[in-house]
Swiss-Prot record:
GO terms for molecular function: porin activity. One of its GO terms (cellular component) is membrane. InterPro entries: Gram_neg_porin_domain, Porin_dom_sf. It comes from Rickettsia bellii (strain RML369-C). Keywords: Signal. Residues 1-19 form the signal peptide. This is Uncharacterized protein RBE_1298. It comes from the Bacteria. SUPFAM superfamilies: Porins. Pfam families: Porin_4 (PF13609).
């Protein structure tokens, strides 16, 4: 009976809040509060890309059309005693792909006072939460990258794919925790974070991560299992890249880091009645977890041929957003330098950087934007231009449409003698976002 009553109260609060235009349903008493928030996205993608093979479809059986969904639901429970706020954020795993953002993901405990806020166990670091990118002012979802294939057979050389970056989030959401090996239920590594209160427009934050492979979405704490030689990997779950090169040799690169420090500083200032400026600088530093290993299976035995040292993780991002009346513009630049690379494998280049910008105009419920993104990873480049529009039917309900044209050019980093190859295409998206 108690469970039924609680469910009825939550449902009533959610319905009332959505109808009244509130984005966050709240259930509160004198010193306790339960805040509910959720998100659902449905999207149709249409892709027209050249240089794809006969069986390189967008979905299993459709070459140019696919649907995509994303969802999240979280409850933040807080209790206030003597001006000290203690609480926990609990995120539920949805039946569709989880929304991977700081607002809708990452269960953790937090304590907040007038001196600042401490987060224990959050998968998102200060560099992620305080960062600013140019794309933040854009309309739509910016999800064109879900519908392209920059590692097709045409782009490969000796069966090795080229490395590309198609989104600025690669640099900001902790470089060491954003790999293809993650399944849809995985979360980034656990962190301890501290954020100062906002003072005269300034806010700072810092996070510590002991081991980026210590994720929260996997069954075991130890997500990378090695055999007796500590280089032959018998179980791979997080951040490991194994590349087959000449003579059937394997180069294994563990892209995890230890003792990672992430930090950020933001500044917000009202320049006038209709003008605002936001600035941000964020960065991350970490030590490589292990050496890169060159190996080969000889007579059914895993044999280590050589080991290589990887460079430290050193990444930063600079961003700014300026708003004047109905106009907004944003720009950002991010760099990884030579982070987690070695000249013995990354022969074609070792540096990675990106920059992007966007301008948007909003009038009433309608918002339209134009954005540009360019990245270079090991001298492999991606250029993308996107036009998007969205219409707020009611608070929390936002249909959108966007069209992106992209071009990717490059080659596998291990083979500098390989020819540069290019693929390009156009992606159209139509979708709806629902937030409460």
């Amino acid at each position: 009976m108690k469970k039924l009553l609680l469910a009825s109260i939550i449902g009533l609060a959610s319905t009332t809040s959505f109808a009244s235009g509130s984005t966050t349903p709240v259930i509160s008493s004198s010193d306790s509060e339960i805040k509910l928030e959720g998100f659902y996205l449905f999207e149709s993608g249409f892709s027209n890309q050249n240089r794809l093979g006969e069986f390189e479809n967008l979905s299993d059986n459709r070459k140019k059309t696919a649907f995509y969904t994303e969802a999240a639901f979280a409850a933040t429970i807080t209790k206030t005693i003597n001006d000290v706020i203690g609480g926990v954020k609990i995120v539920l795993q949805p039946t569709t792909r989880s929304k991977t953002s700081t607002s809708y993901n990452g269960s953790h405990i937090f304590i907040e006072t007038s001196y600042g806020k401490v987060e224990l166990g959050s998968p998102y670091d200060a560099g992620n939460k305080l960062r600013i990118t140019g794309g933040q002012v854009a309309a739509g979802s910016g999800g064109y990258l879900r519908y392209i294939n920059v590692g097709s057979k045409y782009m490969q050389y000796e069966k090795l794919k080229p490395d590309f970056d198609t989104s600025p989030s690669f640099y900001i959401e902790s470089f060491s925790n954003n790999f293809d090996e993650f399944n849809v239920k995985a979360e980034a590594a656990r962190k301890i974070s501290f954020y100062t209160p906002k003072m005269k427009g300034f806010q700072a934050g810092i996070s510590y991560t002991p081991d980026s492979a210590n994720t929260g979405g996997n069954k075991n704490i130890n997500n990378v299992v090695f055999d007796d030689s500590i280089t032959g990997i018998t179980n791979v779950r997080t951040g490991i890249k194994r590349n087959i090169v000449e003579n059937d040799e394997i180069i294994t690169i563990n892209q995890n880091v230890t003792d990672s420090i992430s930090g950020g500083l933001t500044y917000e200032h009202a320049l006038g009645e209709d003008a605002d400026l936001k600035l941000s600088v964020t960065g991350e530093y970490g030590k490589p977890a292990r050496l890169a290993v060159r190996s080969k299976v000889i007579d059914k035995t895993y044999t280590v041929l050589d080991t290589y040292k990887l460079s430290n993780l050193k990444a930063y991002n600079l961003g700014a957003v300026f708003t004047y009346g109905n106009f907004s513009c944003g720009a950002s630049y991010g760099s990884l330098g030579k982070s987690l690379t070695t000249p013995q494998y990354h022969k074609n280049g070792r540096n990675t950087y990106y920059y992007n910008g966007a301008i948007a105009y909003g009038q009433g419920p309608i918002k339209t934007s134009l954005s540009y993104f360019k990245s270079s990873r090991y001298k492999n480049t991606v250029d993308t231009i996107t036009v998007a529009t969205e219409y707020k039917i009611m608070p929390g309900l936002l249909p959108y449409a966007e069209i992106s044209h992209f071009q990717a050019k490059g080659k596998p980093v291990y083979y500098p003698e390989a020819p540069n190859k290019k693929t390009k295409g156009t992606v159209g998206l139509i979708g709806t976002k629902l937030k409460f």
